[in-house]
Amino acid sequence: VMHQTQATWMRTAQQEFKKQTTAKQPEEVNGGLVEYLIALANDQLASADQCEQLLHRLVNQVPSENRGRVRELLDNALNGFLDISKHCLQLLVDIVLFDLRPAFKDMFTFPAWYIEGTTAMITETVRDYAGDYAARLDPNLYDVLSDDLLTRLLAAYLTALRRSARLRMPKAAERFGVDISELSNLISFMRPGDEATSRVEVLHMIHAILSSSSSMVFLPYWTFAKAHGPNLAFIEAVLRARDDMDKNDVTAVLESAKRKIRQENLPDVPEGGPTIMSAVSQTQASAFSNLFSNWHAGPDGDTWSALAQSAQNYLGAAGWRRDA
């Protein structure tokens, strides 16, 4: 019965999310999904805590021959509660990225990114959601959610850079530097301590690549490669997008990179383990939408804005916002 109930929770959450993200008209989107997911995530974590307490209390009270079975049953129930809570967090992250999908279509395009501040709009949207989530989610759940949200956000940002058809230099490098500051401020708002420094380290390295001349770009690239792996497909796409480098310039840099990689026997994955670039390299250009799940929207993206508005309305009601 317990497993059936847990399966029903998982299925219901997923069905409601799919129902709202596949609606063809905004009026088909019903409110309350975010509220439901937050409440369910908190409830399932509390149930897991109670299950663990019960396990500790009972394990020494039952006959020794039954302890293994009791532990197994309670462990399974506990894991089921945690799975549901985690699934709710994933859907809450999906809702944020769903809201951002139209903005990411403008990333690194002219004039939206260069002049209108696409990244600023994205960071403000994420900040708004993060404040709402932090106010209502259990702190442990928010810690998991914020980590996942930022990882997926940065992966989407770097994947958009890789897909860019043209980077107008030097304005692109200047705008990228501004983006680093905006993303760093967002990370500092969402995460503790000095985490922003480590998370944007890769962005600073890429900024150095964008800011270097064709004759000097190999040096910052090699610094990047030693920390994050060769990522030749990524670097080739970025260099080819730069409108101040011609085909011969790019070819020369890539040949130098390949030669140095062979000489140094540089592994694809750094010794310290996978970094954010591992997620970027695994995302093929044709599968960019996978970062945002397989969503379908109505004409002109009406469903995107409708779901986002529904989420914000429910979070803003009855003291859900910090500033309410």
Protein language model regions, located:
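Extended alpha-helical "rod" scaffolds
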Residues: 1-324
